[in-house]
């Protein structure tokens, strides 16, 4: 009530932003006659002039009106397209680091040109992020004409480019590419062994196209680079063989909401008998139990042609949001191998995580982030909370006149599809184009089969036919066109109405199921009614749809019985519509909670990732690691003495045997210390003499290898050790996260426990990195300098896989190594105490 009163007095936040921007648009328009009179050469000369003004300290905001006017004139001269005033508003919103919500067909691609041009003038680079390679390539070529005309360089990052090509594309003023390519390049860069091999530059400014799809839908799946872990494939086949002999409810229970399957007590007994194992919960068999559960998930929860397809003898994941295939992406924790065993195709080795990051944390690293989409308002709270991004709804250029009809609800899926086919036939009879949205490949092919039998010509657009995606979508507005599309495949391609289509009512949209998120339903509707065109939309639902069955079944079944539904008879009832909306709100809240939790846990990893990547980069950039190595030697000696000697006592009380063995193990130095040889030496003198001998040993190694080779060796060994232990640490953190939820039963906050124990694991890893680097440095035998290059090449050429494949493999062995003390020098070599540096 109060909110409504305040809105009437002050206007909504959205209205206030638009009111503030309006004078800027007038100022841009005032430059238009001036720009129009300029010759091509004079217009192009504006770019170096702007760059000079920026170098002289003029802020971008002061340049905005004139720069936007130049970019607009550039678009007119190269593309023959003049951005409307509402597109200028969208451009200003993007420049200010907000999300511009613009309806389908309002020209989002062109909107980005103005803020990209302005921000690229700084020379620090601008990233435009799209959902697929096709759009990245298309937009970089199409809009690239404007930038090139105005004297800026354009790069495009797509799958299949080699490193030099990627580096060149990232070095351009404007870079187009997909979220996956950007994220994986960031991870790959932080696995490189030479600074000059890195391809990305600083993360300055990014505009994310289809921002809801990238920052919300895909945020639940972290980007992961993994490498092969040793495991026998026979295990997967053996376990797969027994799964059909387990019965639902008797031997296992499933929870579709959380996508989990659990063995019952009878199930455990039956599995032990079938596999010939005494006790599945024996620590030595825990690995088998894990793989039984993954095989159950593969058989019970993952459906062929819905979650994955089998193509050319490979199991390929289908993106649940876009319906596109994701070749090269693999499920983690042995699930992908379980699916391969289920489908009886070749099992590829299990993978272990080498590097991982979430989209949330990758995009939050940009100095400035903005986005655009047709549907963001329903998720405005999430954008504000996680990314600190405000959503601004941009007015349409022409009034929207599409008609959205009420949902039609049927009892069964078969009845629903019959009704959908009937409506398609009616539209086809009058040559009215229809776009039908389905939730997965299986449903689109089922509907396609019905239409074939009824003699209705149509096109199917799903992950199996993605090559023709843009072409099929572009023709979806032609007279009599019938297009069946999974989810939001084809986003970014305009559906232009063909001749005579306006007269028969424009493009008609049919949704065959409600999506988990209202936003996705709105995206489907938004394909019709672009730029004031006529159009309509209707959703057909059944009580057998996943959303209804899982989230609204209890309320709806009783309601339906009271209403009394008959076969092939639809029902429209406000209570049912309300129940559906409640179900969608429930799922949206659940998904937001999952994403928020993922981020909270990844934030712990993110702090550790930043420390490791920063140290790696310093090691790559550092001309001389000698001071760092000498500090490590001193730290390790302090660690040995802390456990074996006491400054208050004399040699007869010290553990000289352990000092001898540890110095030999780590530094390769035979000490042969005895109580007799040490006499009455005091602790300080003893420590200093030991350090002096170790320093001399180090200098002898340096003389043996030569100064230049020693520096190379130090850099290589530190990087190689960091990578090895970071990989193991990721695996440890994965296993910690898996079991941490159970702490809730012990009245512990799982997140706090994860932070505390994750930090302890990180401390332990840092100590092990120091130990291993020094041990290798004092023991390694290098005959010639080329050996180092060969070792480095071998390390760089390790096989990698990209996708949702978090670490798997054997549980790590726990070690009782000494942890880095809070007051110890920081292992990164900064010279500060650990608690003041990496241990913060």
Curated annotation (Swiss-Prot):
Membrane topology term: Peripheral membrane protein
SUPFAM superfamilies: Helical scaffold and wing domains of SecA, P-loop containing nucleoside triphosphate hydrolases, Pre-protein crosslinking domain of SecA
Annotated positions binding Zn(2+): 826, 828, 837-838
Cofactor dependency: Zn(2+)
Keywords noted in UniProt: ATP-binding, Cell inner membrane, Cell membrane, Cytoplasm, Membrane, Metal-binding, Nucleotide-binding, Protein transport, Translocase, Translocation, Transport, Zinc
One MF annotation (Gene Ontology) recorded for this entry: metal ion binding
InterPro entries cross-referenced by the UniProt entry: Helicase_ATP-bd (IPR014001), Helicase_C-like (IPR001650), P-loop_NTPase (IPR027417), SEC_C_motif (IPR004027), SecA (IPR000185), SecA_CS (IPR020937), SecA_DEAD (IPR011115), SecA_motor_DEAD (IPR014018)
CDD domains referenced in this protein's UniProt entry, alphabetically: DEXDc_SecA, SF2_C_secA
Top-level lineage group: Bacteria
Region (Disordered): 791-840
Classification via Pfam families: P-loop_SecA, SEC-C, SecA_DEAD, SecA_PP_bind, SecA_SW
EC number(s) from the headed UniProt entry: 7.4.2.8
Localization per record: Cell inner membrane; Cytoplasm
SMART domains hit by this protein: SecA_DEAD, SecA_PP_bind
Co-factor binding comment: May bind 1 zinc ion per subunit.
Similarity comment: family membership: Belongs to the SecA family.
Biological role: Part of the Sec protein translocase complex. Interacts with the SecYEG preprotein conducting channel. Has a central role in coupling the hydrolysis of ATP to the transfer of proteins into and across the cell membrane, serving as an ATP-driven molecular motor driving the stepwise translocation of polypeptide chains across the membrane.
Matching NCBIfam families: PRK09200.1 (NF006630), PRK12904.1 (NF009538), secA (TIGR00963)
Subunit and partners: Monomer and homodimer. Part of the essential Sec protein translocation apparatus which comprises SecA, SecYEG and auxiliary proteins SecDF-YajC and YidC.
Protein name per UniProt: Protein translocase subunit SecA
